[in-house]
């Protein structure tokens, strides 16, 4: 009995999550972004700085590893 109720609860939660994501996708597609200000530069992706820093750290650590093994 408890297992059936748990299974029904999980199914309801998954269904609600799917419907909510579909609702947000439809809502966002109906309201496109307003025309951007022509004087401002295009926005960069949010994770660009973080990814660039990770990339630099990764390259420098690989360089140090190769340098120390030689």
Swiss-Prot record:
Outcome, altering residue 29 to A: No effect on phosphorylation
Query: What triggers production of this protein?
Result: Expressed in the late phase of the viral replicative cycle.
Task: List the residue ranges of the region (Disordered).
Answer: 30-50
**Record's keyword terms, sorted:** Late protein, Membrane, Phosphoprotein, Transmembrane, Transmembrane helix, Virion
User: Which regions span the lipid bilayer?
Assistant: 1-21
Q: Look up and give the membrane topology term.
A: Single-pass membrane protein
Family membership, please give it.
Answer: Belongs to the orthopoxvirus OPG139 family.
> This protein is called what?
Virion membrane protein OPG139
Species name for this entry?
Vaccinia virus (strain Western Reserve)
Q: Mind giving the lineage of the organism this protein is from?
A: Viruses, Varidnaviria, Bamfordvirae, Nucleocytoviricota, Pokkesviricetes
């Amino acid at each position: 009995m408890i297992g059936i109720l748990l299974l029904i609860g999980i199914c309801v939660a998954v269904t609600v999550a799917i419907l909510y994501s579909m609702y947000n996708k439809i809502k966002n597609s109906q309201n496109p972004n307003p025309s951007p200000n022509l004087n401002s530069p295009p926005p960069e992706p949010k994770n660009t700085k973080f990814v660039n820093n990770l990339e630099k750290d990764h390259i420098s650590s690989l360089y140090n590893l190769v340098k120390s093994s030689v």
